[in-house]
Design a protein with these regions (language model features):
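Basic, flexible Lys/Arg- and Gly-enriched helix-loop patches that mediate nucleic-acid binding at interfaces
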Residues: 2-204
Length: 204
């Protein structure tokens, strides 16, 4: 933090181009100057990336006057004002959310032209079937006549007594409430939803 750096400078532990820095007002050229702490070089980091396992009840926003946001989950040490979530998860949805200040990465992950895979785990009220797998593979017409791209549905388990299912779903787009709406289109209801993967980013 800035406060900690000031303390280190006062202790004479920071050097720029092998000269001990005496003032925290010293101007540094991040790409030209060599900065060391206890004679160990420090490397300037421009872009930051955090893979967050978002809990339910937290909103995918940078700030809100009433709700807890994903930015509130960061420690003071990790918090940066230029961070933002890549896309969003519903308030009641858990799982993978990337926080970054890298706009190019965000564009690559969110661009509809890229068809980046997003994998979800869901608990469903209702028994999913082989017919549902085929329907998802063809693409579904969800409410308001909106057509989805083909999606891969995997049925992990079925409880016939409780009439519930556990599924995984791989999407190649990101429509509003898409998983819930696709499951609803085949007559079932999502009761729990967690994102496991976005492109090459996986939950730890």
């Amino acid at each position: 933090s800035r406060k900690e750096v000031k303390v280190l400078i006062k202790k004479g532990q920071i050097k720029v181009n092998e000269e001990v820095i005496k003032s925290d007002k010293f101007q540094v050229k991040e790409f030209d100057d060599q900065i060391t702490y206890l004679d160990e070089p420090l490397v300037y980091q421009k872009d930051f990336y955090y893979v967050l396992n978002k809990p339910a009840g937290v909103i995918s926003a940078t700030q809100d006057n009433y709700e807890q946001t994903v930015m509130d989950l960061l420690s003071d040490e990790d918090y940066r004002e230029d961070l933002f979530p890549v896309g969003r998860l519903d308030k009641d949805t858990e799982g993978l959310l990337i926080l970054t200040n890298d706009g190019k990465l965000a564009h690559r992950l969110l661009s509809p032209k890229k068809h980046v895979e997003k994998e979800y785990f869901a608990k469903v009220k209702g028994v999913m079937t082989e017919e549902d797998i085929d329907s998802f593979a063809r693409g579904l017409v969800i409410d308001k006549g909106e057509q989805t791209l083909p999606a891969q549905l995997f049925i992990d388990s079925i409880d016939h007594e409780e009439e519930t299912s556990a599924i995984r779903l791989i999407l190649h787009e990101g429509k509003f409430h898409q998983v819930k709406r696709m499951v609803q289109a085949v007559g079932k209801e999502v009761t729990y939803l967690k994102r496991l993967r976005m492109g090459g980013f996986l939950l730890p």
